[in-house]
Curated annotation (Swiss-Prot):
Belongs to the Tic20 family. GO terms for cellular component: chloroplast membrane. Pfam families: TIC20. The lineage of its organism: Eukaryota, Rhodophyta, Florideophyceae, Rhodymeniophycidae, Gracilariales. PANTHER family: PROTEIN TIC 20-II, CHLOROPLASTIC. This is Tic20 family protein Ycf60. The chain crosses the membrane at residues 5-25, 87-107, 133-153, 159-179. Keywords: Chloroplast, Membrane, Plastid, Transmembrane, Transmembrane helix. It is a multi-pass membrane protein. The keyword GTP-binding does not apply. It is found in: Plastid, Chloroplast membrane. It comes from Gracilaria tenuistipitata var. liui (Red alga).
Amino acid sequence: MPNKLPSLIIIMLTTFSIILISFIIRQLYLHIAQSYKNHDVNDITIVDRLGSILPYWLPLLEGLQNFGQQILPDYPFNVMQIYKKTLMPLVIFYVTHPTLAVIIFFILYYLFVRNKSPIPDRPFIRFNVLQSILLFLINSLLGATFRALPIEFRMSLYGLMMCNTLFWFVLSTISYSIIKSIEGKYAKIPVISQAVRIQIDNQL
């Protein structure tokens, strides 16, 4: 029981921190949205572009957890060094706090996807949040499927080739989506972006 107490405290503090951060983000968003109230809702502002980039951290960390950790050690030393100094600490934190992904998922869904969202509707942010959630779910499904394969296959040449292909699929789709968000344009990923469009149209 004494050993479980620190873990419980850490979980409670983590949950409280996430709720506090989401509240602060909501207040900032409301304040900024208020300053843009005279703009057309379909105008893509700098806030929309920056806000559309943030949700893609969720599928990126999920993809690095599922595929990156297995194949990146085989990449050139310089690539691994850059990874260790930039993304690896975030991936370690993400892996050691598995409930974090679920909490962030529901926060994004509650704030941006629901019809009765408590914040003003921004179509560009909503599209990218929904797309990032879909990419996260696809990454989770692909990762679970890959881990379910026999370890002999996963460690074989064909298994590593499959893992490498899935890793680059994750990296390319997220990079493309982020670039389009910076440009203020809607991403057009085959099937995925179409599914997001259909979901948004059905909610209108």
